């Protein structure tokens, strides 16, 4: 059947859709369909997830999405698991709730996180605690100016085979883990920083012409010091774009400092226990991708991204004045994936514009390069994004 040819449905008629047709529903019917009768309904059966979706018309002719009990249970479990993981990490990490939310969203979405802040704010401890709470293999690499790519990936060593022959054998580096902490990544040279590129994007590394697949989930959490500190190298644009979000770690509140002292200066030291597995994280990732997004909301996300492009007709005033290069398509992908998870956490079964707005700062701030005028005036990427969110109209790309 051709769904996009349907404008109204006969009473009590049921359409049984394939999975590909089911996925097309949010694009064809962006939650507003003009139907003829009050009792009309469209039923789509998602074969892969065994999930039934119903679109029912109201007397005004608009449709609302009813998610069946099975999917509701899955999404309720998603929220409970997310909160359980966050609560376990919070036993060790004091405050920084927004940082924890965006970090876990990135993990579930299959992305990587870049944390920026001065030393001593708990960036390294956050990554260690996350690995403990997930019972995943964890490795830490302290980036220094003399660190070489082989120290990260691994190298070929000469070994003796069973028959006495000498053969080359690949000795894996610390990159082969589920959770990798790249500590103070901007203290290493660009050559070593670039060694992470293939691993972060392809989840594999190539050594001596042989490709080695990394185990899933693979999550890189890098920390960096502000660039104005001595001995730092700015990350190349290609590597910055590989990070799902960039999070700015701020100083804790006074009340949080008191709690930190209570937890760290007494005999009992809190420690996170494993509450989820890597397999569970992968399941949550697959479930989050099933959340539909209406066509007009998707177009609003596109409008936000192109508004960062100074040469685009929809560019915001601040982008035209202060931005040299805007966000890439990878930034749009991260914006949508993050918004889907935000929708689940907000107990909704579709993406709203507010979900996109809430992800705009962490997703876009490191994907924009300011021009000389912006740098000279002390303008930050966050300033440009906030102005852009105020300027971009919700129907900027209306069909």
Model-derived features: positions:
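C-terminal engagement/docking regions of AAA+ P-loop ATPases
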Residues: 67-69, 313-399
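Conserved C-terminal "switch" segment of AAA+ ATPases
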Residues: 75-78, 92, 232, 246-318, ...
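Pre-Walker A (pre-P-loop) alpha-helix and adjacent loop at the N terminus of AAA/AAA+ ATPase modules
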Residues: 76-113, 118
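Walker A/P-loop
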Residues: 107-144
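Short beta-strand-centered segment that lines the nucleotide-binding/catalytic pocket of NTP-utilizing
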Residues: 137-149, 209-213
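Canonical AAA+ ATPase core
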Residues: 159-163, 188-192, 200-290, 340-342
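Conserved alpha-helical scaffold flanking the Walker A/P-loop in AAA+ ATPase domains
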Residues: 161-180
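Walker B catalytic acidic pair
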Residues: 183-184
